[in-house]
Every structure is written in C-alpha cells, then in structure tokens.
Curated annotation (Swiss-Prot):
The modification Cysteine sulfenic acid (-SOH) is found at C616. It comes from Geobacillus sp. (strain WCH70). GO terms for cellular component: cytosol. Its main location: cytoplasm. SUPFAM superfamilies: Malate synthase G (SSF51645). This is Malate synthase G.
Length: 727
C-alpha cells in the first residue's frame, strides 16, 4: 500500500488525493476543502446503510439455504413462494406507474441502436469505442467472416477485388432494403446528386429516380451536383454514402461510392466494473483519469501498427447541409455512460474514520459524477449530453431497497456537488435474482432518474445457481440458455419495462454477443434480441457495432414494442422454476466435459486478471474460439462447479486434476504473450492458479457467488509479489 494523506478523519491515498486536487477539482466549481469535508460526511452517513444491505443479503441466503435443506426431495412451489414472501425476498408489488425521467438524450430515448461496453483501464479501446458512433460497413464486411471466403473471396494481406465486389454487392443490397429507390436498384446507380431539394439518382441508360420515401434523405456534403457524401436516415439511424471517384475503391465503382458509413454504437458504457481489474489507488486513478480525458475530450493513445506511429483521439462532430441549404451537425461520438461498481466491494484508496476501507460504490458515485460535471460546465472539447444529464450504470443490486439506496446516494452526491436533482441518471442492471423478481419495485425507486434496464445471462445465472445452491445439482451450463426461468427472465424484463413507460424514454437492453470473430453467426442471431423488444444490445467491438446496426434497419423496434406493450403477463412463477437437474443421468464423460469447459474458461480469464491486471480480453475457449470475457464468466463457471462439488456430482480431486490439466492448455494458448507467466508445473507458486482454485473450492461461501473478493485479494498479492521480484 502506498502513502496516505490525513484529510479530516479520512486517510486518502496520496496518489488519489493529488489527482483529485490537481486534475478533477479545478474548474468544477466545487471548493476543495468543502469537497473533502462533505465526502467524509457522506461516507460516515452511508457506510452503515451499505453494511446493513450486505448483511441482509447474507441473512436471506442463509434462510434460503436452510429451507432447501429441509425440503429436499419434497419441493412445493406454493410453499416456496409463501416462504420467500414471508422473509421479504418476494416484495409486495407497487401499483402501476410510469417513469417520469426528464432531460434524456435522443440516443437513449429515441434512437434504437447498438451499445458498446469497454474497459476504462485501456485508453485505446475506450477511444475506439467512443468513436464507434460511426463505422465503415465496407471494412466491417471485408475484414470479418460476415462475407464468406468461398469462390476466391479470401481475406489476404493485400486487397482482393473478388472479395471487394462481394462486399459492395452486399452493401448495395442493404441500401435497397433500408433506403430503396422508387424504381431501379442502388446497384444500377451511376451518380448521386441533390436537385431541387431531392436526392436524384442517375442509373445506367440515362434514367433518373429518387428515394421511395423521400423523407429519408437528410443532407449532403460537397456540391449538390457532385456531393462527397449523402446522408440518409432509416428507423432513426443514419447512413452515409461516401463518394470519391479518385479513391481506389471509388474509382472502380460506377457511382464513385468509396464506402458506406453506418451510425453504429449510439451509446457506449465506459466501464469501471466487470471489465476492469482495479484493486487499489493506482488502478482506480487510471480508471478515473481515462474517464476525465474522455469527458474533457483530451484523451489520446499512441501506439505502433505496421511500423507506423498512430495517435488516437476523439472524433469531431459531422457537419452536413440539408437540401434547403441549412447546416446540421451530428455527433461524431457515442453517448457515454459510465458503469460504477456495485454495493459489495471496498477499496483501500480511502480509509474512513475507523481506518476501514471505504465502499467503492460510494467512492465511484462521487468521483465519476464530479468528473462528469465538467461536461455540464463546458470544460470540454465536445459535448457528451446535449440535455445536461449524465448517465451512471449501477450493477449487481438485489431488490428494491438496494436500488433505493443507490437513489439516496445519487441524491446526496448531487447535493454535495451542486447539481440539480436527477442530473445523474441511472441504468439498472437486472442481473440478480431478487431484482428480477421485484423489477417493477426496483424501477419505482428510481422512477425519476432511470434511463436503462438490461439483462445478462452470465451474472444472472451465477446468482441463480448460488441462491438455490442447496436445492440440488444444477443442469449443465449450456442447457441454462433454453431453461424455463431464463426465457421468462428475458421476457419479463421487457414486459415490465414497457409497462413502466420505457418506450420513448429509456433503454431496454439485452446481453453481449461474446464471439467477436463470429460475425456471420451474429448477423444471423442477434436480430432476435430486437424482435424480443430490446432497443439496444451489447456488442464486443466497434466492428460488431457496425454490423449489429444492420439489425436496427431490418427490425423497426418501435413497432415491435408497440405490439409487446399490449402484453401484461406475470412471469414470476416461471422465473422461480429452479434449474435443478431432476435425476441426472450424466455419463462420466459428460461430467468431465463440463468440468474441462468450465475450468479452462476460469483459468483463461483469471490468469490475465491476476498476473497482468487485464479485466476484459478475448480469451480462447476450450475449442480455441475467442470469447470476449469479463468477470461475469467467472461467476457462472465457478458457481457451477461449486454446486456440482457440493452435491457430489464430481470430487475435489477430480476438479483439481482438471484444473492442472487445463492450466497446461491455457499456458499453451498464451505461449505467444511475452508478459505471460505459466501456471504449470509449479501450481503452488502460481497466484493465478491458486485464485482459480479459491473461486471453485471456496465458491459455496462467497457472498452471492461473487468473484471480486478473491480476485482482489489475489491480485494485490500478485502485485506485491511481482514488485518484490523486480526490486
């Protein structure tokens, strides 16, 4: 642990104290002395409440464990529901209401589109994500498996015109679907021009045509008769046809089209939670400093690619002229949210009056809000919100009393920083069972500031397993995806969100496509999330955002939501169906296959987290398919093995043998990484391997099955160990 400064009754890490005083507070219109005094008061007031909420989690879990032990073999759903109601796990539902959130940006309230999630510890990734508001469709198609490599269309080191032709044909087909012409096809176009306020398209043979729906033409760049860009709009998202007859692609195109740019990631979650490994003041300052750079617009990242030095910075806005000569400006960057941590963890960046670590969620709320305040005061190169709001995603809350606590925290932060009430908007992750079952009540507690609810398979299943740990052995992990409770959870989230008036006001989000290399498959499947009522869904990369944007042109989300709003089904009984395997008949091979898969996934993620502080990366699975993993993958996998161990489906010796065997596989998969520390054969001396063992063998007693306590402890151990070796 580094040096501390005594500030009132707080002890504040010197590194963090200087960062706040020198970089964050100046220009914030918040007095330095008052800030630290108010911060101390806030910590003193809210710490006991935070502790009480965590104690309540443990109390409920203990009662549920006992109930399952007493009723093993004679489970009765009605008795189970009555029990959950008696202990306050199932809350009495509030009356119908609609949210009243005001000052919400169009990217949330009006536009349906992809959402990126990116670790704040990596400046380059964060900048790429912020800039993924617009993406090249040609690049996204050419560089991925979205276009097959059959018939001579291979991706190679140099440009392949056969592949290029397939890309162009695909893109023209997309234009014909999204912005069709009255007659002919975009494939026939030889020129795009603006004549008498309309987009006029000349085709081969001398004929001209216009758009079938002329209102989809928004503007252009360049001269009307020879524009360099045509701006169109469909289902609320923009499309930019770029024209340059001197460009290598443009000069081979009849109409001179060099590319088609799509409005893609309309929102991005800058993440300080599950995709980062931030365990001390040094890490937290990196998270906060990168956020400050993004908000102020001065963050840059310099790196070498192909022998060239490249500097990334935020993209400027895009300016066009409308048909009647007016200028319009569109944002060049994604609207940024920031994800804080949940209520569980503490961090040694600040020690309170009792010398105890402060709750990280309280610290995050104060610091990220103060950073975002700069965008309201105009201390920034670019505007993030045009409505004077900022957006904090709050994860891993259990039930409405925890959401009410987040609301109280945000109220207090607004008062402390001189912000109008409900300036801080909240996104509530629906990823814990008690929140799912009481979602309407959770939303009610933040009805004046909520802008987002979201489902996620991994964390939610982790909590499902842990909550019902004593109910019996769980079904296999892959079978969870088609289980009754999970389908009901996904539908219930949409139904409750729409009934609470989210349409036109807030986002209803769906989970991550975790396979960034499998874009053809994503194009086939991910549109289903929009048909299920989502108006945003998570993607793992800017390229994936561009391709996922195609789904929003194919599916009119507003129409889907209009239909779904008519449904008012209560899914609670289905959500309560515990995914326990009834008389499992798994063969030894099937059990081993499940263990191999889970152990390999745990080790592949943990080894980078513990040894290198990487909280999100493309981790090869057991079949060498790259999966974009964050901490949620650990929770489901470690809890699944812990459950099977607890019920005797496998033995500790078998799991340990599997871990050791899989460690060798993971070592091999990472052989090309010069910073990698192998786990085999000295398993006892590998902090990462020991962390993986802890996650499984101590999984039963982890609070709600969370992985953070073990990860943080082991990462701090690894940092100290490797620092000592370097000295």
């Amino acid at each position: 642990m580094g040096e501390y400064v005594k500030v009132g009754n707080l002890q504040v890490a010197k590194l963090f104290y200087e960062f706040m005083n020198d970089e964050v507070l100046p220009g914030s219109e918040v007095n330095k002395e008052k800030f630290w005094k108010d911060f101390e008061t806030l910590i003193a007031d809210l710490t006991p409440k935070n502790k009480a909420l965590l104690a309540r989690r443990d109390e409920l879990q203990a009662k549920i464990n006992e109930w399952h032990k007493e009723h093993r073999g004679n489970f009765d759903m009605e008795k189970y529901k009555a029990f959950l109601t008696d202990i306050g796990y199932l809350e009495p539902e509030v009356d119908d209401f609609e949210i009243t959130t005001e000052g919400v940006d169009e990217e949330i309230a009006v536009q349906a589109g992809p959402q990126l999630v990116v670790p704040l510890t990596n400046a380059r990734y964060a900048l790429n994500a912020a800039n993924a508001r617009w993406g090249s469709l040609y690049d996204a198609l050419y560089g991925t498996d979205a276009i097959s490599e059959e018939d001579g269309a291979e991706r190679g080191d140099s440009y392949n015109p056969v592949r290029g032709a397939k890309v162009i044909a695909y893109a023209r087909e997309f234009l014909d679907q999204a912005v069709p012409l009255k007659e002919y096809s975009h494939k026939d176009a030889v020129q795009y021009a603006v004549v008498d306020g309309k987009l006029v398209v000349s085709v081969e043979g001398g004929s001209t045509t216009t758009l079938k729906e002329e209102e989809k033409f928004i503007g252009f760049q360049g001269n009307p008769e020879n524009p360099t860009a045509i701006l169109l709009k469909n289902n609320g998202l923009h499309i930019e046809i770029q024209i340059d007859r001197n460009h290598p692609v443009g000069k081979t195109d009849k109409a001179g089209v060099k590319d088609i740019y799509l409005e893609a990631a309309v929102t991005t979650i800058m993440d300080g939670e599950d995709s980062v490994a931030a365990v001390d003041a040094e890490d937290k300052v990196l998270v906060y400093r990168n956020l400050l750079g993004l908000v102020k617009g001065d963050l840059t990242s310099t790196f070498t690619k192909g022998g060239k030095t490249i500097t990334r910075a935020l993209n400027p806005d895009r300016v066009y002229r409308t048909a009647d000569g007016k200028e319009i400006t569109l944002p060049g960057r994604s609207l940024m949210f920031v994800r804080n941590v949940g209520h569980l963890m503490t961090n040694n960046t600040i020690l309170d009056a009792n010398g105890e670590e402060v709750y990280e969620g309280i610290m995050d709320a104060v610091v990220t809000s103060l950073i975002m305040k700069h965008s309201l005061l105009g201390n920034t190169r670019y505007l993030n919100s045009r409505k004077g709001s900022f957006y904090i995603v709050k994860p891993k809350m259990h039930g409405s009393e925890e959401v009410a606590f987040a609301n109280e925290l945000f109220d207090r932060v607004e008062d402390m920083l001189g912000l109008k009430r409900n300036t801080i908007k909240i996104g509530v992750m629906d990823e814990e069972r008690r929140t799912t079952l009481n979602l309407k009540n959770c939303i009610y507690q933040v009805r004046d500031r909520i802008i987002f609810i979201n489902t996620g398979f991994l964390d939610r299943t982790g909590d499902e397993i842990h909550t019902s740990m004593e109910a019996g052995p769980m079904i296999r992990k892959n079978d969870m995806k088609t289980s009754v409770w999970l389908q009901a959870y996904e539908k219930s989230n949409v139904t409750i969100g729409l009934a609470a008036g989210f349409q036109g006001r807030a986002q209803i989000g769906k989970g991550m496509w975790a396979m960034p290399d499998m874009m053809a498959e994503m194009l086939k499947q991910k549109g289903g999330q929009l048909k299920a009522g989502a108006n945003t869904a998570w993607v793992p990369s800017p390229t994936a955002a561009t391709l996922h944007a195609l789904h929003y042109h194919q599916v009119n989300v507003a129409e889907v939501q209009n239909e779904l709003r008519k449904e008012r089904k209560d899914y609670r009984d289905e959500i309560l169906q515990i995914p326990v395997a009834v008389n499992p008949q798994w063969t030894p091979e099937e059990i081993q296959e499940e263990l191999d898969n889970n152990c390999q996934g745990i080790l592949g993620y943990v080894v980078r987290w513990i040894d290198q502080g990487i909280g999100c990366s493309k981790v090869p699975d057991i079949n060498n398919i790259g999966l974009m993993e964050d901490r949620a993958t650990l929770r489901i996998s470690s809890q699944h093995i812990a459950n099977w161990l607890h019920h005797g489906i496998c033995t500790k010796e078998q799991v340990l043998e599997t871990l050791k065997r899989m460690a060798k596989v993971v070592d091999e998969q990472n052989a090309g990484d010069p910073n990698y520390r192998p786990m085999a054969p000295d398993y006892d001396n590998s902090v990462a391997f020991q962390a993986a063992c802890d996650l499984i063998f101590k999984g039963y007693e982890q609070p709600n099955g969370y992985t953070e306590p073990i990860l943080h402890r082991r990462r701090l151990e690894a940092k100290a160990k490797y620092a000592a070796v370097q000295q």
